[in-house]
Every structure is written in structure tokens, then in C-alpha cells.
Amino acid sequence: MHITILNGPNLNLLGTRQPEVYGATTLADIEHMCQRKAQALGLEIEFNQTNHEGVLIDQIHAARSESDGLIINAGAYTHTSVALMDAVASVSLPTVEVHLSNIHARESFRHTSFLSPVALGLICGFGATGYVMALDGIWAHLTAADSARP
């Protein structure tokens, strides 16, 4: 099974950007954590980051033919992008939305997610561990779906 993990704007600055909110873990550290977890689960992953909404949409579209599932931390686009929501909905892949911080405990504008209505699940507030939790969750979902098939 192949999982695409997408990261949106400003996540390339993890480790130095607002460590009191996002922690000291870098995106490279998170990718390494995900690689280790994926290997343990027998998954292949593709891990990407971009600061551009259109690139995220293109990557979601590409995942349609390359992946069995999608994990996305869309950063601030979570709260603003109908286009990302439409892209996720259009590819019909099980999708887990991830946020390092608890978006519901922050500013009120962060309480709205355009992705949650089209996602299988949402993990927020657990820092970098949320990505590992997302891999566990999507693996469990996919293997349950496989075992339910005749």
C-alpha cells in the first residue's frame, strides 16, 4: 500500500517557526518518523511539502492514481481553501487531516476546517506524533477494508 503525505505552507519552517506552538521538531524529523512507522506497517510513503495551493491540488490529483490513501496537513489553507476540499473530495481517497497544534484551542478562525467534511478523520494537538497516529489510522482503515472484501 502507498500513502501520500502532503504538507502545506510554512511547514518547511518547523523547528524554528513558533516553537511554543509547533514544537522543535523539524519537517525532516517528521518525515523520518513517518518513514520508520511506514516501514513497520509495510507501507510505502511519499512525503511532500509546498507553500503553493495549486501545487497541493496537483499533488492530491496525482495521488489518485498513485496512492491508496492521503494524509494532509494543509496548514492555513485548512481554514480557507474550498479548492483543496474539492480536490480531496474529487479523488475519493481515504484522507486523514493532521495538525500539530489543537486547532480548536487556538484563534476562532482556526476552528473551521474545509477539509474535515471530506476527510476520514482528523488528528490535531499531538505534535509530530499526530503523523504517526495518522499512519496507524489509515493503515487500520485500509486493512479493514481489504479484509471485508470477499
Curated annotation (Swiss-Prot):
GO terms for molecular function: 3-dehydroquinate dehydratase activity. The gene is aroQ. Pfam families: DHquinase_II. GO terms for biological process: amino acid biosynthetic process; aromatic amino acid family biosynthetic process; chorismate biosynthetic process; quinate catabolic process. The keyword Amino-acid biosynthesis applies. The record marks 17 as: Transition state stabilizer. InterPro entries: DHquinase_II, DHquinase_II_CS, DHquinase_II_sf. Its EC number is 4.2.1.10. It catalyses: 3-dehydroquinate = 3-dehydroshikimate + H2O. Substrate binds at residues 73, 79, 86, 100-101, 110. Gene3D superfamilies: Dehydroquinase, class II. It comes from the Bacteria. Belongs to the type-II 3-dehydroquinase family. The keyword Aminoacyl-tRNA synthetase does not apply. Pathway: Metabolic intermediate biosynthesis; chorismate biosynthesis; chorismate from D-erythrose 4-phosphate and phosphoenolpyruvate: step 3/7. Keywords: Amino-acid biosynthesis, Aromatic amino acid biosynthesis, Lyase. SUPFAM superfamilies: Type II 3-dehydroquinate dehydratase. It is an enzyme of class 4 (lyase). This is 3-dehydroquinate dehydratase. The lineage of its organism: Bacteria, Pseudomonadati, Pseudomonadota, Alphaproteobacteria, Rhodobacterales. Catalyzes a trans-dehydration via an enolate intermediate. The active site is at residues 22, 99. Homododecamer. PANTHER family: CATABOLIC 3-DEHYDROQUINASE (PTHR21272:SF3).
